[in-house]
């Protein structure tokens, strides 16, 4: 037999082994119906390893043998989610779920029952898996929803993550979203092993899963008992998906993904609540941790009609399980001062294990909450992890109150700077009146200014900000741009290299956008989306600073409260000086050429971008359209006016044609932008 014939035979055997192993992985992980014993599976895998060792050129990234982990990385790379990974609104009571259903009916102008998909909310970490032509090319964390970290090597080690999709009919580009978690049995075994070797135990399965996913050495991840359960899709191009959420889950299962077997449909909101109650009753007997049930409108057409708010879809809600509660003793109450001067009482507790973690602090919110609880230092209290995340005191056990219990005295003066504490007539929150004179407010203002969604100064972390303010090197925002390498290198846990990297990050942050700068200023009630609306409306900081409240409320998403705080911010000379100092330090952006909102040429028009744009990025195209007054939506509906379709446009383009909508290519978009002065 010739060498060529031998190689052909080996290649055929390797291909057959890979297909067999993928098939049996699918039977085992997705269907939970193995067809062969573990020993036979091990023999198939061993034979494949032997052949690949003899013929290294035959090894491909999607081979089942490549799950073992690769060489350690020095750091994770940042990746941008083309379609944001939004969070979900939460419901904590049955009334919240009923209200959610009513909002949907009202928005759809319908009295008919809505069909919902009911899914278990796995307690793990959300991830994104990107497939091109059926092959896994990238895996990422959710991150802040817009940007995450590239953890492809780690995700490849998880057996329930398909490296190559099964079957046919999947889109050319498919982004699958799911939850990586650690089953209880695997978690217990992991901790038992750690206990036997004297290592530190993991607190709960979620923390163990998070630690495993964020290992720079994927071989460590490969040794951890992780699973990935698919629950939705993101980017889809070059193919069609079923018209319901449950249909999509069925398709994902057929392509090799693990989906949750408990998922069901409910024809009424009462059925949703009954499903929640049935799962809650056997929550502890499940093989994995869950922290609630997610209800999603099942029909994709209705999902698209309902749309999104800036942080979450309108068509889904997470009904959280009641938090676990424990009793402990309130040892003291301290008062913290936040970025906007809010003085918040923080309970210092005798440490107690509740909801899977050891809790020693809890929020008391404000003076009204202290009075409502009737709490005293020394009391025995019931602590709950609200939403299984934020510990809070929900009740005082007065029968256990000691004779030496002391009242909680709310301060009249700021515990940090000594300025008077004020409470507005219509607010429950007490605030330090010191403004940026207060070191605590300065610290929080700088942290916000440097945060990822603001000016994104990488390396300027919370602890370093604390040091810089405490040592007097930074007394106002602009001071961070006057820091020297020598000053930074002298800080704790800093060296010359870290100092140089931070100086470069500070320099890079000087080139920003008007929207990010407005957000970075930390004006009360002005979040990321509202800052963008203000930038698009006024075009320049000067025009924004001159606007009165009556003008400001005309801006989309700006109400009377937000308008008041914006006007108040720019009316204060100290804030105007802070802005001037920042601009003098070199912070700059390109002003937007906009006039009044009535004159914006695309006002009232809705655009959808799909496919790949070649001359500019989709983000740039979106920014130009927004600046001209258009609304840019993420999905096609009958309300869409124009669809901009680049190469690779898929289901959105097809739907646009079905609805007989106006479709334009990138060149037509560029002509439109030139016509209105956005491009030369």
Swiss-Prot record:
It comes from the Bacteria. SUPFAM superfamilies: BRCT domain, DNA ligase/mRNA capping enzyme, catalytic domain, Nucleic acid-binding proteins, RuvA domain 2-like. This is DNA ligase. It holds the Pfam family HHH_5. GO terms for biological process: DNA repair; DNA replication. Its cofactor is Mg(2+); Mn(2+). It catalyses: NAD(+) + (deoxyribonucleotide)n-3'-hydroxyl + 5'-phospho-(deoxyribonucleotide)m = (deoxyribonucleotide)n+m + AMP + beta-nicotinamide D-nucleotide. The keyword Magnesium applies. InterPro entries: BRCT_dom, BRCT_dom_sf, DisA/LigA_HHH, DNA_ligase, DNA_ligase_AS, DNA_ligase_CS, DNAligase_adenylation, DNAligase_N. The keyword Isomerase does not apply. One of its GO terms (cellular component) is cytosol. It is an enzyme of class 6 (ligase). The active site is at residue 121. It comes from Cellvibrio japonicus (strain Ueda107) (Pseudomonas fluorescens subsp. cellulosa). Belongs to the NAD-dependent DNA ligase family. LigA subfamily. DNA ligase that catalyzes the formation of phosphodiester linkages between 5'-phosphoryl and 3'-hydroxyl groups in double-stranded DNA using NAD as a coenzyme and as the energy source for the reaction. It is essential for DNA replication and repair of damaged DNA. The lineage of its organism: Bacteria, Pseudomonadati, Pseudomonadota, Gammaproteobacteria, Cellvibrionales. GO terms for molecular function: DNA binding; DNA ligase (NAD+) activity; metal ion binding. Keywords: DNA damage, DNA repair, DNA replication, Ligase, Magnesium, Manganese, Metal-binding, NAD, Zinc. NAD(+) binds at residues 38-42, 87-88, 119, 142, 179, 296, 320. Zn(2+) binds at residues 414, 417, 432, 438. PROSITE patterns: BRCT, DNA_LIGASE_N1, DNA_LIGASE_N2.
